[in-house]
């Protein structure tokens, strides 16, 4: 689909998805995802949008405001937001981003663990495994090849790569949780 929001460039695309009852009960699942080109001045504020949001900044920069803090993100950084809480994000300079609103039975647990170790805005040594999976999610919708178990696996792979990076590079309590 094409967005008609102000400050979203026309080449931007996004997809909306409603998972099955089985998918909601046992999988990670995307709700909306896309590849956006934001013009300078884009800003969005929400009191809530029941999901978690993963953004990968391919080019440019973004700013993020959660209920407690403000952050800046630049190219090759990820942003992870709990959209159940008030939040804002936008860009002053323009940016190109891959993004996915997702949820699932374990989404909050993964979110809390990742953010507690990496923060809301973070980079990882090699973003390609995570960005390739994010692109695969978007491509699944583009090609109308929707397989809930596979979409869940892609989201799980992305989140797990963040946890493994956290454990490997932060050497903290999460290592015991991840390595058994």
Where are these regions (language model features)?
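Aromatic/histidine-rich interaction motifs
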Residues: 113-135
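A short, N-terminal "cap"/entry segment at the start of jelly-roll beta-barrel domains
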Residues: 1-29, 140, 146, 167
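N-terminal regulatory/effector-sensing and dimerization cores
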Residues: 24-118
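A short, Lys/Arg-enriched amphipathic alpha-helix from helix-turn-helix/homeodomain DNA-binding modules
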Residues: 127-139, 151-155, 166-180
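Amphipathic, well-ordered alpha-helical segments in soluble domains
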Residues: 29-32, 53-56, 129-133, 154, ...
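A general structural signal marking secondary-structure boundaries and capping sites
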Residues: 37-40, 83, 138-145, 162-169
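Short, polar/flexible loop-turn hinges at active-site or ligand-entry regions and domain interfaces
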Residues: 43, 117-123, 144-145, 169-170
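Hydrophobic alpha-helical core bundles mediating ligand binding, dimerization, or RNAP-core interactions
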Residues: 97, 107, 134-141, 155-162
